[in-house]
C-alpha cells in the first residue's frame, strides 16, 4: 500500500499551517510542519550561542533532529521564524532535513506536509498539491492580530517589512526556492476564512482519495 501524501506550500502567514492541520485531522493522516524542522535547528544553534551561518554545527543538529520532539509552542516565535529562513539557505542542512521529511512522508496511511518546497522538491509525486497564498498586507495583518491575541506587543509595519524580506529570501534562494508546482491547485486565502478555504480544499481532495480507493 502506498501512503497518501498531500503537499501544501506557500509563503509565511498564508494560512497553510492551519489548513494543513485541519486536513490532516479530517482525513486521519500524519502531519508535519516542515518549517519546524528548520526552526528546530535554529533553536539548537541559538541555545548554544552559535552563529546561524555555522554550517558545521547546523549540519550536526540537522542530523540529530528528532521530528517527534518538535514543539510548536517552543518554536513558533517571530524571531525563530526569521532565524529558520536563514538556516534554510544552507545547502547541506536543507539536503539533510529534506531526506528526513521524505522518510516521514513514507509513513502509512499517509501524511500532510506543509512548507515552501513540498510539492516541488520534498514530495514531487504527492497525490495532492496545494499552493496557498494571500496578499502580503493581509498576511501581515493576520500575523499582527495573532501576536496581539497572545498578549504580546506588535508593530504592523515591522511585521509587513519582515514578511516581505522573508518572501524575498524564500523566492530567490538558489536551492529549493518557494514556487508553485506546475500541478498544484492554487488557493488564494486573501478573502477566504479558514473554514471556506478548508471546504474548497476538501472538494479538491475528496475525488482524488475516492479514485485511489476505487483504483
Swiss-Prot record:
InterPro entries in alphabetical order: Cytidylate_kin, Cytidylate_kinase_dom, P-loop_NTPase
E.C. code: 2.7.4.25
SUPFAM superfamilies for the chain: P-loop containing nucleoside triphosphate hydrolases (SSF52540)
Binding site for ATP: 10-18
Keyword NAD assigned: no
EC supergroup of this enzyme: transferase
Protein's cellular compartments: Cytoplasm
Biological process according to GO: pyrimidine nucleotide metabolic process
Molecular function in Gene Ontology: ATP binding; CMP kinase activity; dCMP kinase activity
One GO CC annotation: cytoplasm
Gene3D superfamilies: P-loop containing nucleotide triphosphate hydrolases
Keywords: ATP-binding, Cytoplasm, Kinase, Nucleotide-binding, Transferase
UniProt catalytic activity: CMP + ATP = CDP + ADP; dCMP + ATP = dCDP + ADP
CDD domains referenced in this protein's UniProt entry, alphabetically: CMPK (cd02020)
Positions of transmembrane segments: none
Chief place of localization: cytoplasm
Family designation: Belongs to the cytidylate kinase family. Type 1 subfamily.
Record's protein name: Cytidylate kinase
Name of the encoding gene: cmk
